[in-house]
Amino acid sequence: MGKRKTMQSFNLESFGKNLEKKLRRNPEQLQQPIKNYKSERERDIHELIYTIKSERMFIYKNAHRHLKLALENATLALNLPMLLKDFHVTLKEFDALEASLNAELECLELQYSSDTSELLLPVNSVNTSQNTINENAITTAIASLSVNPVNTSVALSTASTSTSTPTNTTTTTTTTSNSLTKNNNSALVSKPKTRGVRSKPIDMNSSDDEEDDQKDDQDKDDSDEDNVDNTPPLDSNDSKPPSSKTKGISKTKTKGNVSTAITTTTTPITTTDSNIIGTTTTTDDITEESKVKERPPRIFPENCYVCKVTETPYWRRGTDNGVVVDLCNECGLYYMNKEKKERLSRQKHSIKNVLN
C-alpha cells in the first residue's frame, strides 16, 4: 500500500481573513419586510436589528468552519479556544444591544398606538387627577395659613391628607416663658470636664480642694503632653458670659537649660442667673529645668588619617591600636572589607580545626 499523504498546514489567521472576504462578497441578508414606519427612529431601530441578526449568522458560520478545520488538522486546534471565546463575547454584545433596541421599539409603539390617534402617556408620567387633588390640598393649606397664621401644624396636616376643606382644630403648640427659661438653662449649662482618673466634678465651695486639683492637673500635663489643651489664658479685661467654662493651660518649652513657664487658668461652672456664684481664678507659675538631649554638632575632620585627603563625600571612622581615627570614604571601605575578609578566614580556620 502507498504512503498516506500528509495534509498541508494552514495558517488560521489568513484562512479566517479569506473566509471573511468571501462571505462579505455574497452575504445572506435577511429579507426586510415592507413596513410603513411612523418615525425615523423606528426605521433606524429596525435596520439595526436586522444587521445584528445577519452579523450573528456570519459568526455562527465562521465558528462552524473553524471547528471543521480543527478536526482536520490538530495544529489548528490550539488557537480554537481563544477564537471561540472571542465569538462568545461578540455574541453577548449583540444580544445586549438587541434587547435595548427592542425595549426602545416597544416604547415607541406604545406612544404611537394604532387604536387611537392621541398619544399615550409614558410609564413615568403621573395621573392628572392626583395632581389636581394635590393642588387643591396645597391651596387649602395656604388659605388656612392666611386665615390662622398660628395653626401651622393644622395647615400642614391638611396638606398631607389631601382634604378639600381645612379642619378647625385648636391643638396648637405654644411655648411659655417658663419653658423657654428652662430650655435656655439646659442649653447653656455645661457638664464638668473630667480628666485622667478623676471622676468627681470640680467643687465650687472649697477653694483648697480646687487648688489641689489644679496642681494634680499640672503634674499630669507634665507627664503626658497629648492631653494638654493649648488654649490661651483668660484675661481679666475680656467679657464672657457667666455660664461659660474655660480651662486653658499654656505651656512653653525651649531647648537647652531654659526655664519653662506653665500657666493654668480655670473658671468654674455658673448658672444663667444674674447672681454669679463664686468664681475663682488661680495662676501658678512653676519653673523647672528641662533636660533635652541635643544632637552634637557635626564636626568635619581636617584630613584622612591614611591618605591625608581633605575632601571626601563621606567620612568614616576606624581604630588604630585602640585609638579612633578619621578616614575618607575609600580608605574606610578598603579597611572595612579587609577586616571582613580576615574575620571570615578566621571563622573558616576555626571550623577546620574543630572538624579535624
Curated annotation (Swiss-Prot):
Acidic residues biased stretches: 206-228
Pfam (any one): GATA
GO MF: DNA-binding transcription factor activity, RNA polymerase II-specific; RNA polymerase II cis-regulatory region sequence-specific DNA binding; zinc ion binding
Example GO BP: positive regulation of transcription by RNA polymerase II
Residue ranges, compositional bias (Low complexity): 158-188, 260-284
Start-end of GATA-type zinc fingers: 304-331
SUPFAM superfamilies, per the entry: Glucocorticoid receptor-like (DNA-binding domain) (SSF57716)
Coiled coil in keyword set: yes
Residues forming coiled coils: 91-119
Domain of life: Eukaryota
Region (Disordered): 158-294
Cited InterPro entries: Znf_GATA (IPR000679), Znf_NHR/GATA (IPR013088)
Keywords in alphabetical order: Coiled coil, Metal-binding, Zinc, Zinc-finger
Annotated Gene Ontology cellular component terms: nucleus
Name recorded for this polypeptide: GATA zinc finger domain-containing protein 17
Organism, as annotated: Dictyostelium discoideum
